[in-house]
């Protein structure tokens, strides 16, 4: 009996504790969803509801240290919304309408009553519960901001059926992909290195696999992606074009869950769940198996040829995250990401050079990757302020090894061996310490501020060479240029709802970059304003400045391990940009349709590029002697029409854009179009939910061709030939277009994904290469063959089908 009484007492104590949880809230005419954020921070509870029931619901409440149950009752009084607190969840629903009942019989009867049902009964429509993670564009002051869920990423058909974050963003207006099939991204006339990629707020320098065919983000464990391209939050700086923060899932307390995905080119596994009552975990692993698939193919090729081909490649992504809840006010987290690429290529030839059994073995080994680790604490200081403190480490490394071995035997049988070896590596190591605060000083105002310190360590290039013969051994090392830099950033911004119609976001970001005993600084003001004359329409304007201290040196537009990240040193100045944007936004009354038009103009200064004839510089010349700084502009208009809800969703967008560059040491100092000066870009994305089991997806993209420099003349010397100077980016490729399709079929345990890349097999031209054609000409001595230079179009990817299966458990 005592045990029963004790259990009852414990139960009543728990119920009393939950119902008596105290909160402090002050809001006047604010949207209910906004007030929920305050309640979540103070109680840690989850609010479960359909977003439809809160449309247009504004609440006024001002309480101090009152039970949550009483606060909710006061908030929803007279709104027709009911709530129920169950465990850690607060569930909301509409109150049922009162109904009038009429007795079937006038008095108690002991008789059998027979009813006939109408066969033409009215069937109720299915109840669809929808949730929208991001606020509609008309409700915010931001321009060019987008929040994308993992489901939206998976609904974008891509190459090899690999759901890809960056390729999903390529479907947004103002964003172009660069080279076909690659995960590069060029935003509003910017370069590929002007985008800041972050994983849970930690920067990453290399976000691609296999020259950019795949990005480094495993969609299976992603929660959502924040993307900014016009009005930049003051929190972010360091890049000129865009900011992308990929947020990972947290583990769940409601049991262990996971999935296993098997595809033609890769597989992935993820698992999550609780560890005790206060800790959760999530683990994700993705690996390609090109190294396995190429084994039988190479075995067949090498069995028939004297030349033996060597090719082996794989990539891997590993994510792990642990979250621990100390109390409703404090939560700690730790996470790690490791991305790894390995490429081995080369050949072994039998030579016929007069020596017995002579062979040449030529090998290249590439190894590159990322490591990101962080630990942090979220802490609610008081009902109006919360903070996050983080320590992080991010590293990019790249290593290339080349070995060329020649073996033979002399006439007297003595072995003859020569070997040439070369090793080149570059890396970046950053230690990051940051503190971010979120403060709500009064109704309608949300202030964010913080600071961070970064210790950079750059090793742009380190090369060693070894030459070995039977009688000598010569080893050389190129000069190593290593840099250490200290970076300090601070920011503050206020997201202010001035009135029901006016809102604004004003902030400033200050930065200091110290290297080689010199300090460089940047002040980046940010301002965006919105006027909303009615519930369905808004007009916005924004200005932002950005400063960039690190840059990527690349001689191609592919994501290669030989690309180098270097800091601003010596005479070079940090890149800066100033951007203005205006836009109009509309949303239908039923929240199903949305449309927007945005215009922008961007000025860029101190851009870095290789100067003309940089290849004539001595090989060991300092890298900065080959560079020059200049300026650029970008302008354009982005239009978008979007259907948000329903069985058929998607969007159509069109961009009209111009982008140019001007360098004193390029193109004779005259302006020239940027490589990705794509005048017209059209994107169409459609998602059709055919039934509960089947979904069809289609993505069509088309844009004006990329530009590049076509050299029409060559200077031939006695020992070499070199191109004569031509106008930079003087040729434009043909119009690019492609259709991708996918179909998702669900079953009880998981789902199949069938995809078709380049469905109508249009071979797009991605480059022009110089070749030589043999031409026979009649002379006085008869026909004579000569080589004539010609230009050939390079076309890459035809129609490519793929299939994968995901098992969920």
Located regions from the model:
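N-terminal export/assembly leaders
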Residues: 16-104, 145, 187
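C-terminal beta-signal and adjacent terminal beta-strands/loops
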Residues: 292, 693, 702-719, 744-809
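Flexible loop and strand-edge segments within Gram-negative outer membrane beta-barrel domains
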Residues: 329-380, 395-427
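Outer membrane beta-barrel strand-and-loop segments of large Gram-negative receptors
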Residues: 430-434, 478-484, 489, 573, ...
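Gram-negative outer-membrane beta-barrel transporters
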Residues: 601-603, 625-710, 806
């Amino acid at each position: 009996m005592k045990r029963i009484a004790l259990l009852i007492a414990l139960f009543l104590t728990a119920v009393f504790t939950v119902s008596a949880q105290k909160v402090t809230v002050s809001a006047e005419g604010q949207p209910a969803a906004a007030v929920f954020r305050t309640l979540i921070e103070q109680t840690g509870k989850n609010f479960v509801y359909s977003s439809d029931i809160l449309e247009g619901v504004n609440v006024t409440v001002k309480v101090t240290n009152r039970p949550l149950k009483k606060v909710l009752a006061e908030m929803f009084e007279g709104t027709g919304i009911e709530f129920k607190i169950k465990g850690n969840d607060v569930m909301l629903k509409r109150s049922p309408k009162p109904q009038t009942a009429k007795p079937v019989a006038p008095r108690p009867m002991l008789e059998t009553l027979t009813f006939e049902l109408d066969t033409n009964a009215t069937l109720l429509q299915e109840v669809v519960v929808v949730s929208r993670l991001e606020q509609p564009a008309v409700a915010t002051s931001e321009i060019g901001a987008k929040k994308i869920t993992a489901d939206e990423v998976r609904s974008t058909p891509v190459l090899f059926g690999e759901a890809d974050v960056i390729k999903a963003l390529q479907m947004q207006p103002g964003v172009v992909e660069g080279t076909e099939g690659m995960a590069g991204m060029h935003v509003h006339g910017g370069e590929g290195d002007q985008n800041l990629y972050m994983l849970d707020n930690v920067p990453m320098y290399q976000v691609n696999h296999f020259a950019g065919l795949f990005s480094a983000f495993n969609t299976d464990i992603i929660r959502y992606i924040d993307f900014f391209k016009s009005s930049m939050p003051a929190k972010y700086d360091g890049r000129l074009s865009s900011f992308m923060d990929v947020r990972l899932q947290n583990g769940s307390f409601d049991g262990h869950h996971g999935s296993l995905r098997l595809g033609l080119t890769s597989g992935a596994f993820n698992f999550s769940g609780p560890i005790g009552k206060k800790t959760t975990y999530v683990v994700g692993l993705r690996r390609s198996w090109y190294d396995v698939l190429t084994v039988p193919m190479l075995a067949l090729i090498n069995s028939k040829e004297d030349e033996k081909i060597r090719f082996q490649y794989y990539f891997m992504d590993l994510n792990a995250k642990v979250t621990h809840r100390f109390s409703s006010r404090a939560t700690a987290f730790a996470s790690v990401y490791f991305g790894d690429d390995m490429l081995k290529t080369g050949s072994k030839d039998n030579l016929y050079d007069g020596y017995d059994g002579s062979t040449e073995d030529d090998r290249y080994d590439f190894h590159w990757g990322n490591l990101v680790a962080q630990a942090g604490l979220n802490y609610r200081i008081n009902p109006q302020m919360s903070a996050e403190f983080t320590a992080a480490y991010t590293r990019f490394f790249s290593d290339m090894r080349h070995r060329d071995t020649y073996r033979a035997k002399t006439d007297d049988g003595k072995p003859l061996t020569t070997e040439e070896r070369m090793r080149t590596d570059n890396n970046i190591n950053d230690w990051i310490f940051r503190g971010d605060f979120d403060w709500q000083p009064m109704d309608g105002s949300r202030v964010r501020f913080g600071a961070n310190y970064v210790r950079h360590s750059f090793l742009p290039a380190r090369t060693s060479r070894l030459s070995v013969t039977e009688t000598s051994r010569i080893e050389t090392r190129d000069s190593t240029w290593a840099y250490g830099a200290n970076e300090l950033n601070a920011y503050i911004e206020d997201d202010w709802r001035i009135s029901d119609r006016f809102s604004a976001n004003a902030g400033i970001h200050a930065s200091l970059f110290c290297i080689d005993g010199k300090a460089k600084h940047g002040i980046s003001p940010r301002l965006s304003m919105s006027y909303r004359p009615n519930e369905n329409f808004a007009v916005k304007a924004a200005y932002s400045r950005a400063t960039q201290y690190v840059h990527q040196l690349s001689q191609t537009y592919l994501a290669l391990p030989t690309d180098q990240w270097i800091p601003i040193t010596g005479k070079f100045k940090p890149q800066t940009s100033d951007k203005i944007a205006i836009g109009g936004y509309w949303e239908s009354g039923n929240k199903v349709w949305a449309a927007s038009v945005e215009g922008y103009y961007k000025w860029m200064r101190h851009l870095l590029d290789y100067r003309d004839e940089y290849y004539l510089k001595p090989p060991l010349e300092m890298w900065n002697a080959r560079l020059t700084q200049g300026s650029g502009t970008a302008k354009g208009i982005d239009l978008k029409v979007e259907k948000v809800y329903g069985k058929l969703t998607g969007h159509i967008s069109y961009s009209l854009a111009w982008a140019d560059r001007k360098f004193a040491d390029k193109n004779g100092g005259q302006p020239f179009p940027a490589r990705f000066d794509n005048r017209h870009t059209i994107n169409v994305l459609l998602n059709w939910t055919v039934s509960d089991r089947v979904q069809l997806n289609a993505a069509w993209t088309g844009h004006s061709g990329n530009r590049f420099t076509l050299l029409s003349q060559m200077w031939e010397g006695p020992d070499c030939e070199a191109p004569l100077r031509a106008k930079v980016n003087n040729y434009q490729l043909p119009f690019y277009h492609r259709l991708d399709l996918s179909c998702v079929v669900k079953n009880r345990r998981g789902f199949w994904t069938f995809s078709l890349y380049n469905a109508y097999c249009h071979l797009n031209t991605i480059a022009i290469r110089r070749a030589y054609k043999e031409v026979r000409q009649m002379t006085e001595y008869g026909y004579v063959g000569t080589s004539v230079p010609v230009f050939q179009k390079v076309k890459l990817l035809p129609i490519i089908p793929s299939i994968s299966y995901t098992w969920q458990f």
